[in-house]
């Protein structure tokens, strides 16, 4: 184990612990979301999912900027992040899809088991990302998939097909973008991700009323990421920096 940065001050140590606490707070949001699911409150559950996504999106850049790994080498932020992500990105969305009938009764157990199984294998990969910071395989972001299914009221057969495809892609070498870390089109990807989350939140607050503009965003955002996934995978070589 590497030693702590000898130049780190008490303030640096406190900041590092605070950032780890921010990451760990995702389990509290996940627990709140699970309670909402069990109580039959889909809107509340989605709000918890979105809050967890926001935390997951900001803790990494903050940790890297604060050099947390150097300050607290005895705490592995990557492992902490993976543990939290499996709860908020996989287990909570699976519970959501099971409780709120995203799939037909005969398919629910099979597909939920497939999601849990393929996702845990993905999290165990030793090389999760390419040299230019694209994910290898579908990165188990079911926290985006499940609310999108629900808010779009997509037909159950569509949900089945998409879920099977994503489970298969989880264990492949298909390249999926990390909006924050991939330099190529970073601004566009962050904007699209932000619009997706905003549309998801507003449509959730409006539910059960549907908004056509918001529904369009909920379709267009994943369509954009599907396009750049195909583009990057077909190219093979690392994407240009800009």
List each language-model region with its residue ranges.
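Hydrophobic, membrane-facing alpha-helical anchors
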Residues: 1-6, 59-64, 104-123, 160-175
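C-terminal membrane-associated helical module and adjoining short loops/tails
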Residues: 1-6, 135-242
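Active-site-proximal cofactor/substrate-binding loop regions of enzyme domains
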Residues: 7-68
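Multi-pass membrane catalytic core of lipid/isoprenoid biosynthesis enzymes
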Residues: 19-24, 65-122
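Membrane-anchoring/interfacial helices and their immediately flanking loops
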Residues: 118-141
């Amino acid at each position: 184990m590497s030693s702590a940065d000898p130049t780190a001050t008490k303030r640096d140590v406190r900041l590092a612990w605070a950032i780890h606490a921010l990451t760990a707070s995702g389990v509290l949001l996940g627990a709140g979301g699970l309670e909402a699911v069990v109580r039959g409150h889909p809107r509340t559950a989605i709000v918890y999912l979105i809050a967890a996504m926001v935390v997951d999106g900001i803790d990494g850049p903050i940790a890297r900027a604060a050099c947390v790994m150097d300050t607290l080498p005895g705490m592995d932020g990557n492992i902490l992040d993976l543990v939290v992500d499996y709860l908020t990105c996989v287990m909570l969305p699976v519970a959501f899809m099971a409780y709120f009938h995203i799939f037909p009764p005969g398919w629910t157990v099979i597909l939920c088991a497939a999601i849990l199984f393929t996702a845990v294998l993905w999290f165990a990969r030793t090389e999760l990302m390419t040299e230019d910071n694209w994910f290898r395989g579908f990165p188990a972001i079911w926290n985006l998939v499940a609310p999108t299914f629900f808010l779009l009221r997509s037909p159950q057969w569509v949900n089945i097909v998409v879920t099977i495809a994503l489970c298969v892609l989880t264990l492949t070498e298909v390249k999926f973008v990390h909006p924050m870390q991939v330099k190529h089109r970073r601004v566009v990807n962050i904007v699209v991700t932000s619009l997706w989350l905003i549309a998801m939140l507003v449509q959730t607050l409006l539910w059960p009323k549907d908004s056509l503009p918001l529904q369009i965003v909920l379709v267009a955002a994943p369509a954009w990421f599907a396009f750049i996934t195909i583009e990057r995978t077909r190219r093979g070589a690392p994407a240009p920096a800009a």
